[in-house]
Amino acid sequence: MNCKIGILTFHKSINYGSVLQAYALQNLLLKEGYKVEIIDYEPKNYANMYIPFKKPTTIWNILHNLNRVPVGKIIKEQNEEFKKFRDTYINLSREYNFESYYSDIFSQFDCVICGSDQVWNITLDDCDDIFFLPCVKHIKKIAYAVSVNDAKFNSCIRDIDLKNCISEFNYISCREKSGATKISNFIAKEDVAVTIDPTLLHSAREYDVICSKRIINQNYIFLYDMWSNSDALYAAKVISSLFNLPVYTLFTKRNVKSMIKISKYGVKVITKNMSPTDFLSYIKYADFVITDSFHGTAFSLIFEKQFVCINEKQNSGKLKNDERITNILSELNIEERYLRVDNIHSVKDLDNINYDIVTEKRNKLAKKSIDWLLKAIEE
């Protein structure tokens, strides 16, 4: 237990799932007796992704800023609430950025865990080379429940030898079966495991420690929709009518155009109490949850809510078919919870989720994943 572990993940994202999965993995390892720090690394693109306003150097940036002027104060407050959460609940190393030497970042650790979240999704703006630990020697390297999502691996896609970097990891596990297969084929190794997201390793009782008290003092439906998608909003409108309950959603798209769009569907936009601990409260106390998000799904399962996931149409017209969601629903035998919007009225015909069965299955998956991780650290 003298092993000092560094966790490298998307802990600085203004994204509820990202910060809570970082918190969850950290707390699991602390509970097991390890010394743990989240490596406080900021990728090159982070600042530009999350600042309320961009430098007015292009027409696009000017239009972007105009769309945010009416909500700039809300965005700033949300950013501050995320920072407060990190400062309070995340055990951070000192700060590093893309200009830091890798030797300075990693020399203090015996083991580095990359993940979870989409840290190996090379199509994302915040997927930095560092998440593949290039030129990092003499420490154990573990990838835990990394997600590649739709990314196609190619050794030439980055400035590093991607295949060689991944091959040098001592242990690799992926969050989705398809991702594990993709990584196995890429590096020609068959021992890539499938493990569940860190958030799902804990019970609701462990999140109750940080969960805010009830905020909405009425019965309600909670919509967690990352992109203000029309399919999810239409589903919310239909389900609100079926259940005769109001729908609340968090301010995630972070611009006034989306806020107006959401309001047109009769959904109430939450613009205060937006911290990750508040997010937990909105799910915990909801009568029903609608989501298009993997972590919206995960916390619905953790708090044993009745819920549906919306299989949205993309700009191409094709269904999203999010493998992160389909994988966990399949593991728990509740695939019927993933609905197309043209089938949304069938929600009233769904049987209630039997959480005696589902939570037992989730606990077994959690034990298997924890056993894999502890073995990877100790061997």
Where are these regions (language model features)?
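Active-site anion-handling motifs in enzyme catalytic cores
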Residues: 1-379
